[in-house]
Structures are given as C-alpha cells and as structure tokens.
C-alpha cells in the first residue's frame, strides 16, 4: 500500500486533506506532531535551493522523530534589541549528521518571499550554513528578511514556504512550557510526508 494513500483516511478525519491541489511550483507536506498536525506548502519555484533541501530531508525521513525544541517569544529574549517570535525544529544532532551538506543562502531580496505569519524559513548561523533546522514565524517578522536587523550580517534568512493548515498548532507549540527558549519537553514530530 502506498504510504501517502494510507494517510488519506487520517487526513479526512482530521480535516487536513488539502482542498486545493498544490499549485505549480509548490509541494505540500503533512507534519504530524504530538500537539497536532499541520500542512506546509513549500515554494519550489521561488526558493528552489532551500525547498529542495527541505524536501530531501522529508523524503529521507530525517524529520521523523525530530522535535520542535525552541520557542522564541517577546519575553524570553533578554538583551536582544530586535525581538522576534518563532518556533524552531530540527532532527537530533545524530540524525542531522546523517543529513546533507549546508546550502547557499537564498535571500528574500532574490526570492521575493517575506517572513510573514506562518512562513517557513531555514535556521542558520552564518550565510551558507543552513542544513536541517527550520523555523515557523508567529506573526509577521520583517527583521528576518534581507536587510533586517535580527542577524548582524543583514543577510536575513531563507523563507521557503508557509503553513496552509494548522496555524493553531503553531500557536500551541509557541505557547508550550519552556525553560528560557527551550521547550520542556520538546514537541515531537511523529512524521513528515509529502502529500499528493
């Protein structure tokens, strides 16, 4: 049995079946977590490098068992002049090592994507260092775009998609118990699969 077809009854029961097929240049991904499910739309047309990287982690099932481990709220960023609100997820360090090399930074000045509410973006240190960790914006976060002040290098982060179903799940994870920015306990990603 095709694993994607096996998910169809679950999607219908949860009300998560996409009402519209993904448009050209996009792919949809079902994320099942211990706090609820969401559907992501990955923009393969405008952010091809970042989207391809994310989807290869999905297809290799390296996000299965990964965790939303970080919640950044206005109140838990002491000493930070530019504050943001996001949740961040990624595989364990051991699983991440089985992943793929870092990718070039696709700047929002090139892709035209912006860090709006529900947008997906890659976590990074310096430019061209993103691998598996990603985050979801809670509210609009323009300081994460190219030229924004959150990262001192001003290069911004690579937005590559958005949550199209399940924003209440994002907000539940954002408000979950945390010690500083570390979710306690982390929210487990049971599985991530492409949708037809």
Go through each PLM region and give its residues.
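Cyclophilin-like peptidyl-prolyl cis-trans isomerases
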Residues: 13-196
């Amino acid at each position: 049995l095709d694993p994607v077809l096996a998910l169809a009854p679950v999607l219908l029961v949860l009300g998560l079946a996409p009402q519209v097929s993904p448009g050209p240049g996009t792919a949809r991904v079902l994320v099942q977590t211990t706090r609820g499910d969401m559907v992501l739309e990955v923009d393969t047309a405008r952010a091809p490098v970042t989207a391809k990287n994310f989807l290869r982690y999905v297809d290799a099932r390296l996000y299965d068992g990964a965790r939303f481990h970080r919640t950044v709220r206005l109140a838990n960023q002491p000493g930070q002049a530019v504050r943001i609100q996001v949740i961040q997820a990624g595989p364990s360090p051991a699983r991440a090592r089985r992943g793929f090399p870092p990718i070039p930074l696709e700047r929002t000045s090139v892709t035209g994507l912006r860090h709006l509410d529900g947008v997906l973006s890659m976590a990074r240190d310096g430019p061209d260092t993103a691998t598996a960790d990603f985050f979801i914006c809670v509210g609009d976060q323009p300081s994460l775009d190219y030229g924004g002040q959150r990262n001192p290098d001003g290069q911004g982060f690579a937005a590559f998609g958005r949550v199209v179903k399940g924003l209440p799940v994002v907000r539940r994870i954002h408000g979950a118990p945390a010690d500083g920015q570390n979710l306690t306990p982390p929210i487990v990603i049971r599985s991530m699969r492409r949708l037809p």
